[in-house]
């Protein structure tokens, strides 16, 4: 019985971190967004927190974390089979660097490449920094 209570406490504490804005979570695409749903992926809300725990964080992880933190404020995030993130079950995002192409999300409706180190977007390629304006 004690194990079940501890699990409930962990779930409530995790949910408090998500609601307080310290963490963002993305569930599997086919699951609902409730407190008891195990997240597929957990993101820090602030990329600076990542450096406190792991100074050698990969650039790709930082990019995904930044995008998730900006989208999580007004959208529900889920993990797709292809791509990196889905917002509100509708918009698919693939995150990468300047040379990131469309091959991983080719032919998927409402899909976008979010690229770091570009100033201006074109077609369905969006600069990563632009998502900072959503916040």
Regions found by a protein language model. Give the residues of each.
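Accessory nucleic acid-recognition modules appended to NTPase machines
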Residues: 1-83
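Short, solvent-exposed polar/charged micro-motifs at secondary-structure junctions
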Residues: 35, 86-91, 122-124
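Active-site-adjacent loop/helix micro-motif of nuclease/hydrolase catalytic cores
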Residues: 54, 98-107, 121-123
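Short, glycine/charged-enriched secondary-structure capping and boundary segments
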Residues: 58-59, 106-108, 126-128
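Conserved catalytic cores of phosphodiester-cleaving nucleases, focusing on short active-site segments
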Residues: 71, 85-104
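Hydrophobic beta-strand segments of well-ordered beta-sheets in folded domains
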Residues: 89-92, 109-113
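Short, positively charged
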Residues: 116
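Domain-level recognition of nuclease-like catalytic cores that cleave nucleotide substrates
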Residues: 119-135
